């Protein structure tokens, strides 16, 4: 025998099973605690999309204004439930370079896609501006006449848990030709 009788490599009593269950429960709670803050934060953020907005009327008004001001229109498809939509909005409102190009060269419209899969909002606009299947947020750039210049998934603009300001800026610049 390799070990003395007093040394036990495994306990076979019920206390070992209880100990294992407590450890498993503790591990599950730690994982849950790590996941919940991000979900709670996204739900507690202020609404940036307006589900009651008449997007067709707003786009029509933006086209008129864009023609006068010689700017493009940036449609940002997403929803208040979407953490990535809030992250992109945060970048648009906080990064000085991105904020400047948006203010100078674009009119922004946030297009709410709805919260319920069976009851989507603005589905016709999602299809018209070719962002169907992209995931959210998705971008569509219109010229000053309202013609679609490009539709873009924002997945390629991501970096870590947010959007890369340099990639977003490069995308916005390519749409205005500078």
Model-derived features: where do they sit?
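N-terminal leader/targeting and pre-domain segments
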Residues: 40-69
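Short active-site neighborhood of thiol/selenol oxidoreductases, capturing the structured segment around
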Residues: 69-82
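Thiol-based oxidoreductase modules, predominantly thioredoxin-like and allied folds used
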Residues: 98-121
């Amino acid at each position: 025998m390799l070990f003395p009788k007093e040394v036990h490599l495994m306990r076979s009593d019920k206390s070992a099973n209880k100990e294992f269950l407590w450890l498993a429960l503790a591990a599950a709670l730690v994982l849950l605690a790590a996941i919940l803050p991000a979900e709670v934060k996204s739900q507690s953020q202020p609404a940036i999309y307006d589900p009651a907005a008449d997007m067709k009327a707003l786009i029509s008004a933006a086209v008129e204004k864009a023609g006068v001001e010689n700017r493009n229109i940036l449609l940002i498809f997403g929803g208040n439930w979407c953490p990535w939509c809030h992250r992109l909005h945060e970048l648009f409102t906080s990064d000085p370079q991105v904020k400047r190009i948006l203010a100078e060269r674009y009119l922004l419209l946030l297009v709410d896609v709805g919260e319920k899969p069976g009851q989507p909002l603005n589905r016709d606009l999602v299809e018209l501006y070719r962002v169907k299947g992209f995931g959210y947020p998705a971008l569509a750039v219109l010229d000053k006449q309202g013609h679609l210049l490009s539709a873009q998934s924002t997945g390629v603009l991501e970096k870590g848990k947010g959007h890369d300001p340099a990639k977003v800026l490069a995308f916005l610049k390519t749409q205005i030709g500078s």
